[in-house]
Amino acid sequence: MKNMLFIAVIIFNALRVSASQETLIHGNIESGGFGGPVFKMGNIYHEAALMIGGRGGWIINHQYMLGAGGYALVNEIPSKQWANYNMDLGYGGIELAYIQNPDKLTHLSFMILLGGGSVGFTEQGRDQWDESQDFDTFYIAEPGVNLILNVTQFFRLGLGGSYRFVKGVQGDSELVSKDLSGPTLVITLKFGTF
């Protein structure tokens, strides 16, 4: 009888502990996903810069996003050291986001990109892989905030800002990390199930 009572107490305590356990994501997990183009405008190396890329991700319970993104410089930024050379710049990484009130017509999302990239200067008219000057790689952390508009059930439009924190650029003579760091205006088109 004592053994039965002892076992009943242990089972009751185990059920009570498991019922009160707190987790970040609780209940049934709802999944969605999205992808789409991203346009970034800002200053790089004291010049106006336009970067185009894309991002995609897994949306968990309509509020958390785990994904990836990649971006490349599309306009010409000339070298200040070598005549007829323009900057080649690209970066990417994992992206994490929290989406606040995703069911509202307009809402905010807070995100961060953590990754790496490369930068160098390529002679005009030549492929970037032929010959680059002052080529280097770097680490990047880019936190941002976006105002999101729910256009349709499957389309979201975002307008926001981010800041590129770049570290590790140690070019021979022309570029340093602060030349690539700075604020950015971001326009995002997202297609998927949210």
Label every PLM stretch briefly.
Residues 148-194:
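Predominantly the C-terminal beta-signal and adjacent terminal strand-loop region
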Residues 27-33, 62-64, 104-110, 153-157, ...:
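Outer-envelope beta-barrel architecture signal
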Residues 38-46, 73-80, 117-124, 165-172:
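Sequence/structural signature of outer-membrane beta-barrel proteins
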Residues 33-35, 50-54, 64, 90-94, ...:
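Hydrophobic, lipid-facing positions within transmembrane beta-strands of outer-membrane proteins
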Residues 1-24:
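Bacterial Sec-dependent N-terminal signal peptides
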Residues 33-41, 54, 68-72, 110-118, ...:
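Transmembrane beta-barrel strands of outer-membrane/channel proteins
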Residues 17-66, 190-194:
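Short glycine/proline- and aromatic-enriched beta-strand/turn motifs that initiate or cap beta-hairpins
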Residues 63-142, 149-151, 191-193:
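Gram-negative (and chloroplast) outer-membrane scaffold detector with strong preference
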